[in-house]
Amino acid sequence: MKTYTGKTVDDAVSKACLDLGVTIDQLNYEVTLETKGLFSKKAEIACWTVEMVQEYIENLIRKILTDMQFEVETVSYVQDGRIYCNINTSNNSILIGKAGIILRAINLIIKNAVSTTFKKRLEVSVDINGYKEERYKKVASMARKFGKTVLRTKADLKLDPMPADERKVMHQEIAKMDHLKTESKGEGKNRYMTISYVD
């Protein structure tokens, strides 16, 4: 985050926008100081842009993984309000882990670091060599298969526990099918979902 001061909050915001080359809509800020004395006024803001968050994420990932002796390249982009960062490396299997467990841990570390640094919960997704994208395609395919089974049998289907992002893909895919509804149940790593038939 960067800090800017001015006689008023608006003044500090204007300085930040000018310096960072962004519009006020692209600037996220919080007022850290505002005094209104008889002889002097002063305001201070701490601010950031999405581009600053992207740079922070890429730098943090590279630092963590290069310290662990991995050679990596990172590419980030923003889509639908979510920040995506893809890690390119020759050590995918090690960094992804069994069933993606290491990749989920990396995501958790990065999300927590971003929330702490920028004092806001932001949607962040870290992938390694397109693993999650391929995994989501498989999950979507499974969802269609499970949906057809429930439509045929009209019996509820309970799925094994899965990560939140994969459950989301399941929910979205089933929502495209008529006469079906989904529900998430359970807590933490045991959270699972059910698919039910509805008239």
Where do the protein language model's features map onto the residues?
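RNA-contacting regions in translation and RNA-metabolism proteins
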Residues: 1-199
